Swiss-Prot record:
InterPro entries: ATP_synth_asu-like_sf, ATP_synth_asu_C, ATP_synth_asu_C_sf, ATP_synth_F1_a_nt-bd_dom, ATP_synth_F1_asu, ATPase_F1/V1/A1_a/bsu_N, ATPase_F1/V1/A1_a/bsu_N_sf, ATPase_F1/V1/A1_a/bsu_nucl-bd. It catalyses: ATP + H2O + 4 H(+)(in) = ADP + phosphate + 5 H(+)(out). Its EC number is 7.1.2.2. NCBIfam families: atpA, PRK13343.1. One of its GO terms (cellular component) is proton-transporting ATP synthase complex. This is ATP synthase subunit alpha. It comes from Streptococcus suis (strain 05ZYH33). PANTHER family: ATP SYNTHASE SUBUNIT ALPHA, MITOCHONDRIAL. It is found in: Cell membrane. The record marks 361 as: Required for activity.
Length: 500
């Protein structure tokens, strides 16, 4: 029998031990919806860039924090969202899945697979916005990144950790340059990330199939926000890509990331900013469009040994109109990057591919990463090519030419021919050095221009068969072998070939 005092003590004990179980979430109400933008009132403590959830499960991101309401960009379909719909805070900044489980997959900027190969099994995530490495956390660029393209590796060399802009009109081969660079990373201990922004889905499919065909998908992640996707996804795609790259960089690995292209990201950001009623500036872009790209590209770096010594090399693309590199976005990105490769449509249409304009293209830091052998054979190539272009323009007047000028023109024509390269056929650096050595030492001066491609292919096959040791010296020591031996080998090839 329990007496009244025991009941009273028991009740008192339970009351004292009572823990109220409630879930506190700050919610707001949608006051406007349209064009992928929502405005909501009641989210007074929302953070900039915070993820918000609508009652139908759609995710949004807080962009404008105003006195009365919050401007939200919607990351998905917004047809089910109405005025009066409830939206709640999550207290989280946007993150994407990262790690080696993503390699070989095609995903959207939210980290969701779009290749039909099932879910991605990784528990690691990283925020898409993250501070770039500081000054003391970086190292100078000192390792080469071989693209496999003679015109780039000789004239505008790229180093690991560099940002090299690829700029040109549409249909000048920008994507082909980047895809070839990715193909050439096979066996180089490099992870590649291809970010397709605003591309046609059929085009992305073609690129993915090319990567798969050449075995490059084994070390590549494809992040795609196609032209049919809402603007917020196009805006976020590059940040998602670089967050995935950072995970590998801080593990001490090397990453090549391609942004194809940042012009479309800037247009998507302009669209969002105007819809959010932000004040427009030059060409109607918002005032912070420079920061849009600088905070992205500054995250590409060669980090110090204390942080693992990894690197992110970035190849951002900018599409120009009629070759105008003085446009707003083009000049912004040129000033952020460590050099640019300028592709010209008149070169492309005349059959010079890759259509690199050697005069306008520059690499500000890659030269220090170039291997010794390439420095020796390609040292004067840029100046020779520039002087050839001047002479060629001069000869349009039909003047009589002396022997020295004629020799320069002949060498220049052969240089242009040697720097041409078929699509998806990147070349190992030792073979690039071999053909450029043959060119700069006069072995091609007697070869007819139409036969240079055949000369090149037969020279590689001959060296693979008879002089693989010389190629191995270039490959391992990164320097030229004994020049007498190399001259004798090339002469032996010429003597037994039809190219006397």
């Amino acid at each position: 029998m329990i007496n009244a005092q025991e009941i009273s003590a028991l009740l008192k004990q339970q009351i004292e031990g009572f823990q109220p179980d409630f879930d506190y979430t700050e919610t707001g109400v949608v006051t406007y919806i349209g064009d992928g933008i929502a405005r909501a009132q009641g989210l007074d403590n929302a953070m900039s860039g915070e993820l918000l959830v609508f009652e139908n499960g759609t995710i949004g991101m807080a962009q404008n924090l105003e006195t009365n309401d919050v401007g939200i960009i919607i990351l998905g379909q917004f047809t089910d969202i109405r005025e009066g719909s409830v939206v709640r805070r999550t207290g989280k900044i946007m993150e994407v899945p990262v790690g080696s489980a993503l390699i070989g997959r095609v995903i959207n900027p939210l980290g969701q697979p779009v290749d039909g190969l099932g879910e991605i099994r990784t528990s690691k995530t990283r925020p898409i916005e993250y501070p770039a490495p500081g000054v003391m956390q970086r190292k100078s660029v000192n390792e080469p990144l071989q693209t496999g393209l003679k015109a780039i590796d000789a004239l505008v060399p790229i180093g690991r950790g560099q940002r090299e802009l690829i700029i040109g009109d549409r249909q000048t081969g920008k994507t082909s340059v980047a895809i070839d660079a990715i193909l050439n990373q096979k066996g180089q201990d490099m992870i590649c990330i291809y970010v397709a922004i605003g591309q046609k889905e059929s085009t992305v499919r073609t690129q993915v199939e090319t990567l798969r065909q050449y075995g490059a998908l084994d070390y590549t992640i494809v992040v795609t926000a196609s032209a049919s996707q809402p603007s917020p996804l196009l805006f976020l795609a590059p940040y998602a890509g670089v967050a995935m790259a950072e995970e590998f960089m801080y593990e001490g690995k090397h990453v090549l990331i391609v942004y194809d292209d940042l012009s479309k990201q800037a247009v998507a950001y302009r669209e969002l900013s105007l819809l959010l009623r932000r004040p427009p500036g030059r060409e109607a872009y918002p005032g912070d469009v420079f920061y849009l790209h600088s905070r992205l590209l500054e995250r590409s770096a060669k980090v110090s040994d204390e942080l693992g010594g990894g690197s992110i090399t970035a190849l951002p693309f900018i599409e120009t109109q009629a070759g105008d590199i003085s446009a707003y976005i083009a000049t912004n990105v040129i000033s952020i990057t460590d050099g640019q490769i300028f592709l010209k449509d008149d070169l492309f249409n005349s059959g010079i591919r890759p259509a690199i304009d050697a005069g306008s293209s520059v690499s500000r830091v890659g030269g220090s990463a170039q291997i010794k052998a390439m420095k020796k054979v390609a040292g004067t190539l840029r100046i020779d090519l520039a002087s050839y272009r001047e002479l060629e323009a001069f000869t349009q007047f039909g003047s009589d030419l002396d022997a020295a000028t004629q020799a320069k023109l002949n060498r220049g024509r052969r240089t242009v021919e040697v720097l041409k390269q078929p699509l998806h056929k990147p070349l190992p650096v030792e073979k690039q050095v071999l053909i450029l050595y043959a060119l700069t030492n006069g072995f091609l001066d007697s070869v007819p221009i139409d036969d240079i491609l055949a000369f090149e292919e037969e020279l590689y096959a001959y060296f693979d068969l008879h002089y693989d040791g010389l190629l191995d010296v270039i490959r391992t020591t990164k320097d030229l072998p004994d020049t007498d031996e190399l001259n004798a080998a090339i002469q032996a090839f010429k003597d037994q070939s039809v190219f006397k």
